[in-house]
């Protein structure tokens, strides 16, 4: 239940006690990946139709993104022959679950945080900015740069494997959601720093809080003491968890409809 819902709850204090073999770690990785893909993936695969291939386009992009990360990690990062643990950390990061093993390399922390921020599918239990948003913004940015060199040429904002063109209004929403994330990250980091938590821990904890990801050893926050936090600190951590899950952009759109009906 914890894995399906992208939760990080464990029946024991350390996950190492539950999965001690490489096979079990690989199996755990693939089960966590399920929450990275769309909730409708199983349905779309069962009732597959060539006319409805566009419904699988986001998941195909996610699969390519996942395979690139796994291949890169296996070739370049598997220096200590602990790839199963790295695979668990990758699966846990992209699905915003956050659990990891104690032998996960600490020098890969930046990569894990980037994957946590990117997140997974629009229609998944994971959090993050979402892969398609990132791809759409990259495509739009490249087209804008190319339009200055070849102004007479028409450029499409279609993302690879997606038939529909990304509208300018959607691009604006995607960009605005990233701005909101940056502002939220800055505010929460500032609040945590004012609560006498050092800047590094405040910054890491802010990312994980906004992205609804459990802190663990791969983020070097496994020993962070939440119990002794002040009431106000716990309250605004909860508030930013809700903002990260619901997305502040959605809340602003709802308020706009109520406040500016005309």
Please place each PLM-identified region on the residue numbering.
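Membrane-proximal intracellular helices of multi-pass ion channels
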Residues: 1-262
